[in-house]
Amino acid sequence: MPKMKTKSAAAKRFKRTAKGGFKSGNSFTSHRFHGKTKKQRRQLRGLSMMDKSNVKRYKKMIPAK
């Protein structure tokens, strides 16, 4: 049986955690910050956890690890 290939687009965007979850960067962070509050901008920094409802789909995209 052939190996499962990793979706390269998913590998670039998502990181797998030790417990099997996924982290990703936030959207709405590239421009137009004048329309966002300081709190919004602060909370959009860094990575955020993906919702549990999508984890099964992401595990198929990134089978290794």
UniProtKB/Swiss-Prot annotation:
Stored PANTHER family: 54S RIBOSOMAL PROTEIN BL35M (PTHR33343), LARGE RIBOSOMAL SUBUNIT PROTEIN BL35M (PTHR33343:SF1)
| GO biological process, alphabetically ordered | translation
Name the Gene3D superfamilies for this protein: 4.10.410.60
Q: Which HAMAP family does the annotation name? A: Ribosomal_bL35 (MF_00514)
Lineage of producing organism: Bacteria, Bacillati, Bacillota, Bacilli, Lactobacillales
Q: Which UniProt keywords apply?
A: Ribonucleoprotein, Ribosomal protein
> Which species expresses this protein natively?
Limosilactobacillus fermentum (strain NBRC 3956 / LMG 18251)
* A cellular component term, taken from the record's GO annotations: cytosolic large ribosomal subunit
Which gene does this sequence derive from? Answer: rpmI
Stretches for region Disordered: 1-65
NCBIfam families per record: rpmI_bact
| Family, as annotated | Belongs to the bacterial ribosomal protein bL35 family.
Record field: compositional bias (Basic residues) = 1-18, 31-44, 55-65
Protein name, per record:
Large ribosomal subunit protein bL35
Gene Ontology MF annotations:
structural constituent of ribosome
> Which InterPro entries does this UniProt record tie to the protein?
Ribosomal_bL35, Ribosomal_bL35-like, Ribosomal_bL35_CS, Ribosomal_bL35_sf
What the entry lists under Pfam families is as follows: Ribosomal_L35p
